[in-house]
């Protein structure tokens, strides 16, 4: 996934009200841009740290740009725009880059299913059945550790998705929880039980029910992002 036009660089002044970030560009221009991340962004940003943003020329937009990448306090690069995860995964699926999910004959997005009226990110159609794939974007890293964690804030919605996948898995349907790790320098992923023990428990129960758990790491730069390697999942 290439950024077109290329991202612009700035320094973070502050993030506030979840959806807003004040930044300063190298030429001294102060901008308020959109922050497309509803999580805590814990360990994912630092005031004064480098950020990269996409600029919009759409006169209908109230804000001139969107925060895309951040240099973390640990010196890693993170894609903070969670809306990038699904297109990034779809690109990898269509390219055959996710070895466990190749050979499908059809791909459907945002399909409603389950008793709790959820929407799964992707349904992959195979000659012998369908695979339900739920995607989560991971950006929570820690100093001196190559292990990232999810979530960075409590997420009942995430636990609900796992419950729904578990129901299908018990019925013999192939279900996959796929962690899209948009953070450089990572070798493995784990549930952040210290932040959301309910989600961690839901993940363990989903695995026991037969839900597959995959994690793929991204190669990130201000020019492009792409999923390049499978990562270990530590349950």
UniProtKB/Swiss-Prot annotation:
Q: Which Pfam families match?
A: SfsA (PF03749), SfsA_N (PF17746)
Q: Which Gene3D superfamilies match?
A: 2.40.50.580, 3.40.1350.60
| GO MF entry, a single one | DNA binding
Return the InterPro entries for the record: SfsA, SfsA_C, SfsA_N
Family assignment?
Belongs to the SfsA family.
**What's this protein's name?**
Sugar fermentation stimulation protein homolog
This chain's source organism reads: Azotobacter vinelandii (strain DJ / ATCC BAA-1303)
State the encoding gene: sfsA
């Amino acid at each position: 996934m290439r950024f077109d036009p290329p991202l612009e660089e700035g320094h973070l002044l502050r993030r506030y009200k979840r959806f807003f970030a004040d930044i300063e560009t190298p030429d001294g221009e102060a901008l308020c841009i959109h922050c497309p991340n509803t999580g805590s962004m814990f360990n994912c940003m630092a005031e004064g740290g480098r950020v990269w943003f996409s600029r919009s020329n759409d006169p209908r937009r109230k804000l001139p740009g969107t925060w895309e990448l951040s240099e973390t306090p640990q010196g890693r690069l993170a894609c903070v725009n969670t809306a990038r995860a699904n297109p990034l995964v779809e690109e990898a699926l269509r390219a055959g880059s996710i070895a466990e999910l190749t050979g499908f004959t059809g791909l459907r997005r945002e399909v409603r299913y389950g008793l709790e009226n959820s929407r799964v990110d992707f349904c992959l159609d195979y000659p012998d059945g369908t695979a339900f794939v739920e995607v989560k974007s991971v950006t929570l890293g820690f100093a001196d550790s190559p292990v990232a964690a999810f979530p960075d804030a409590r997420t009942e919605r995430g636990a609900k998705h796992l419950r729904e996948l578990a129901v299908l898995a018990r019925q013999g349907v192939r279900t996959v929880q796929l962690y899209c790790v948009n953070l450089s320098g990572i070798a493995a992923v784990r549930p952040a039980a210290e932040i959301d023990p309910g989600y961690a428990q839901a993940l363990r129960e989903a695995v026991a029910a037969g839900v597959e758990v995959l994690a793929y790491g991204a190669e990130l730069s201000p020019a492009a992002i792409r999923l390049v390697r499978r990562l270990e999942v530590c349950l």
